[in-house]
UniProtKB/Swiss-Prot annotation:
Entry's localization field: Secreted
Protein's name in the database: Bone morphogenetic protein 7
GO annotations of cellular component type: extracellular space
Gene Ontology BP term (one): positive regulation of DNA-templated transcription
Cited InterPro entries: TGF-b_propeptide, TGF-beta-rel
Main localization (coarse): secreted
Stored Gene3D superfamilies: 2.60.120.970
Function description: Growth factor of the TGF-beta superfamily that plays important role in various biological processes, including embryogenesis, hematopoiesis, neurogenesis and skeletal morphogenesis. Initiates the canonical BMP signaling cascade by associating with type I receptor ACVR1 and type II receptor ACVR2A. Once all three components are bound together in a complex at the cell surface, ACVR2A phosphorylates and activates ACVR1. In turn, ACVR1 propagates signal by phosphorylating SMAD1/5/8 that travel to the nucleus and act as activators and repressors of transcription of target genes.
Keyword terms, alphabetized: Chondrogenesis, Cytokine, Developmental protein, Differentiation, Disulfide bond, Glycoprotein, Growth factor, Osteogenesis, Secreted
Organism domain of life: Eukaryota
Species in which this protein is naturally found: Canis lupus familiaris
GO molecular function annotation: cytokine activity; growth factor activity
Similarity comment: family membership: Belongs to the TGF-beta family.
Positions of glycan attachment: 114
């Protein structure tokens, strides 16, 4: 569920880093061998580049989505999901060296395996009453319905902007469309 996805990801990340560094914390005062147990099956959580960032970092933080329910859609054929994160827990003076928006994409059984979709992540720049928000495209990916696993989007610049200007933190929007532009509900 929503409230345990970030902690489970952090546990998996810890286990991935511990295994990579030589088997975990057994050499750190534990008298028993450490066996990593991962909560998700799938591709590695940390890429080689992520591992370099993590090795140099003195802190890793995870944030859960604060949006409980998506707003009613103004345009009945435009579907999206909203995500908001409270970055006020980042200690003052700390530099954010990397920030990622990670979502897990399930296998879409209701579609043909080779059907392709475009997944786009937008920064919400301004919200309006009675019409769509102003958005800035951060990244998009084209995926098959049969693909499954973590999707990682780099939002370092956006999160740094939000840390410096918290009132501009209006969140992210995720949109899914077919390649011919038909909006799909990203449930």
């Amino acid at each position: 569920g929503k409230h345990n996805s970030a902690p489970m990801f952090m546990l998996d990340l810890y286990n991935a880093m511990a295994v990579e560094e030589g088997g975990g914390p057994a050499g750190q005062g534990f008298s028993y061998p450490y066996k990593a147990v991962f909560s998700t099956q799938g591709p590695p959580l940390a890429s080689l580049q992520d591992s370099h960032f993590l090795t140099d970092a003195d802190m890793v933080m995870s944030f859960v989505n604060l949006v409980e329910h998506d707003k009613e859609f103004f345009h009945p054929r435009y579907h999206h999901r909203e995500f908001r994160f409270d970055l006020s827990k980042i200690p003052e003076g700390e530099a954010v060296t990397a920030a990622e928006f990670r979502i897990y994409k399930d296998y879409i059984r209701e579609r043909f395996d080779n059907e392709t979709f475009r997944i786009s992540v937008y920064q919400v720049l301004q919200e309006h009453l009675g019409r769509e928000s102003d958005l800035f495209l951060l990244d998009s990916r084209t995926l098959w319905a049969s693909e499954e696993g973590w999707l990682v989007f780099d939002i370092t610049a956006t999160s740094n902007h939000w840390v410096v200007n918290p009132r501009h933190n209006l969140g992210l929007q995720l949109c899914v469309e077919t390649l011919d532009g038909q909006s799909i509900n990203p449930k």
